[in-house]
Amino acid sequence: MKVAILFLSILVLAVASESIEESRDDFAVEELGRATCAGQDQPCKETCDCCGERGECVCGGPCICRQGYFWIAWYKLANCKK
């Protein structure tokens, strides 16, 4: 009985570990895509979605990713949509 409980515990841990590893791989791919997009001089999108909420949309230029307050980025984004 103890052997069966030990075996089932190991099996549950193995399945949980595999699930966590798959989630980690998905997250790494997503982060890599975001970092790559932010490092390139791409045309400014209306939503600046490449930069997330920290984007400053420069009209006629690339989407510049920088740290800052959300409402400043939103104001810059609104000016670009004119």
Swiss-Prot record:
Its main location: secreted. It comes from the Eukaryota. Residues 1-17 form the signal peptide. GO terms for cellular component: extracellular region. It is found in: Secreted. Disulfide bonds join C37-C51, C44-C57, C48-C80, C50-C65, C59-C63. The keyword Acyltransferase does not apply. This is Delta-ctenitoxin-Pn2a.
